[in-house]
């Protein structure tokens, strides 16, 4: 933990950076550091973080993931309410935004809170690249995140209930691709989705390069074998592979995993009620996101809660404005220290 703290202090050489060390674990007595910038963090945020961490007493804190579960308010939500990172520059940028960073002994992962959905689709490289390149990459991530859990359900809804909205050549192509397949389309999609999830989990457990190989080559081999055996149609294999590719474009593994879970709920609702069920599932997910909060801040900021952001946080959302326009810190920082760029903000 001292090394991790030193990595942050090397990048943020300010006397206003404070590190509060506490002990966690009734028997393990693990060291936990709470870092924040004194004049940027809002009053009460550090105390709220400590209160959440002290809400339960356990024997041992083996990793920062244990602290993360105790610090989350809505444990039943599939979406992560805290941001994690292994990069010191990401932690420093979060501190300069008025957020709190929590480090745990024997863990390379830092916990950042509060956080919003927008933070899970941003990367540190977005601020190191030019505006056009960063905005294009970020736009692709947003589209990929949406498609990663909606494509299979939309396919089932359209092909089972609403084929009239498709062009006739496309309908015939779908029909010819399914000739000889003994299973309904729902079973086909579930079989391939579960196979890809199994390959992904197996790739994590296997060592090194072998794990990456089994995830890619294994998917191709199983998909081709399933098509040759007339178990699934080629359209379903392409659809599932493209959906998996979209999930890989999401920077945060925890955030991508939430979409992987919700994907099956959307599939079942779409197969049951068609396009109506597809829309119901999207509305339920949207309502849940709208109600979710992280340390009191709306999870969907800056898309909701514009009265809190003043319209400035929207400049660093789907499109990243030039750095000279990002003169204001996010809403997490104190109002009197909101300005982070000296110069003409209208330049």
List each model region and its residues.
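Transmembrane alpha-helix detector for multi-pass membrane proteins
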Residues: 144-163, 175-253, 258-259, 264-270, ...
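Positions that flank functional sites
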Residues: 27, 110, 214, 241, ...
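Hydrophobic alpha-helical transmembrane segments of membrane transport and translocation systems
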Residues: 234-236, 240-347
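Cytosolic regulatory modules rich in charged/polar residues
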Residues: 1-185, 294-322, 331-347
């Amino acid at each position: 933990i001292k090394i991790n703290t030193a990595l942050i202090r090397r990048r943020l050489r300010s006397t206003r950076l404070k590190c509060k060390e506490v002990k966690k674990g009734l028997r393990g007595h693990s060291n936990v550091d709470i870092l924040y910038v004194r004049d940027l963090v809002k009053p009460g945020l550090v105390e709220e973080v400590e209160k959440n961490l002290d809400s339960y007493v356990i024997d041992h804190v083996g990793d920062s993931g244990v602290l993360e579960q105790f610090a989350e308010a809505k444990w039943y939500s599939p979406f992560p309410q805290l941001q994690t990172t292994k990069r010191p520059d990401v932690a420093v940028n979060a501190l300069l935004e008025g957020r709190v960073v929590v480090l745990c002994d024997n863990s390379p992962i830092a916990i950042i809170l509060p956080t919003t959905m927008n933070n899970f689709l941003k990367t540190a490289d977005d601020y190191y690249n030019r505006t056009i390149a960063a905005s294009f990459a970020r736009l692709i991530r947003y589209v990929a995140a949406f498609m990663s859990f909606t494509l299979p359900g939309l396919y089932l809804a359209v092909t089972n209930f609403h084929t009239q909205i498709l062009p006739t050549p496309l309908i015939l192509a779908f029909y010819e691709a399914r000739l000889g397949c003994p299973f309904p389309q729902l079973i086909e999609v579930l079989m391939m989705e579960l196979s890809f999830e199994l390959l992904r989990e197996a790739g994590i457990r296997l060592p090194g390069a072998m794990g990456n190989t089994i995830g890619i080559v294994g998917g191709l081999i199983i998909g081709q074998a399933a098509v040759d055996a007339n178990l699934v149609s080629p359209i379903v294999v392409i659809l599932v592979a493209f959906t998996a590719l979209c999930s890989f474009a999401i920077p945060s593994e925890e955030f991508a995993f939430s979409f992987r879970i919700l994907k099956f709920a959307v599939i079942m609702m779409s197969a049951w009620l068609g396009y109506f069920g597809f829309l119901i599932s999207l509305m339920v997910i949207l309502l849940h996101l709208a109600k979710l909060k992280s340390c009191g801040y709306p999870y969907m900021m800056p898309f909701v809660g514009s009265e809190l952001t003043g319209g400035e946080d929207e400049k660093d959302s789907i499109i990243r404005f030039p750095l000279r326009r990002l003169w204001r810190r996010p809403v997490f920082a104190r109002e009197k220290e909101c300005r982070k760029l000296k110069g003409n903000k209208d330049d």
